[in-house]
Design a protein with these regions (language model features):
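Alpha-helix initiation/capping motif
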Residues: 3, 7, 11, 20, ...
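A generic structural signal for short beta-strands and their flanking turns/coil linkers
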Residues: 29-31, 41-43, 86-90, 102-104, ...
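HotDog/MaoC-like acyl-thioester-processing domains
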Residues: 1-13, 98-100, 110-153
């Protein structure tokens, strides 16, 4: 079927609601992760790789930061379709390191969603060097819904 687009004003209200929900995510804030953009079924988050907080022993973004960035993008993507999700599994393929001082982003795209499970593909990129850092796939369990956020917009 043809997807009906909501008016831009409504889309902006949904984005603002999801952003407000995630402004209370203490772990995201502690890591310095912020939302860049979102649309129905997709989200992009980013973080500047801080040498004091995020570096591994090789002066690159720690793999835990890369995986955390991907994981946060999945939860936000779920919220864009009105679903409160928790991670069941996330498999991350690390491709290339991102040096400290660079900004990395994770973009998630929902590939399947029903009332119980959401599956998502994620790409993590080094924005300063235009390189692919990691690819991940996640299975998210739906634990609740977010009132006022439709599944399609």
């Amino acid at each position: 079927g043809v997807k009906e687009e909501l008016p831009v004003v409504e889309a902006e209200k949904i984005k603002a609601k999801v952003s407000e929900i995630y402004s209370h995510n203490n772990f995201m804030q502690e890591c310095g992760i912020y939302i860049v953009d979102m649309s129905c079924g997709s989200a992009t988050v980013a973080v500047k790789v801080d040498p004091e907080r995020h570096a591994n022993l090789n002066g690159m973004a720690h793999g835990g930061l890369v995986a955390t960035l991907a994981d946060n993008a999945t939860g936000i993507a779920g919220a864009t379709i009105g679903k409160r999700v928790v991670t069941s599994t996330i498999a991350t393929d690390f491709i290339k390191g991102a040096p400290v001082g660079t900004t990395i982003s994770a973009t998630s795209r929902i590939t399947h969603a029903d009332d119980r499970l959401v599956t998502i593909n994620i790409e993590v990129r080094d924005l300063d060097n235009d390189t692919l850092v990691a690819k991940a796939t996640a299975a998210m369990i739906v634990v609740d819904t977010f009132a006022g956020i439709p599944e399609k917009w």
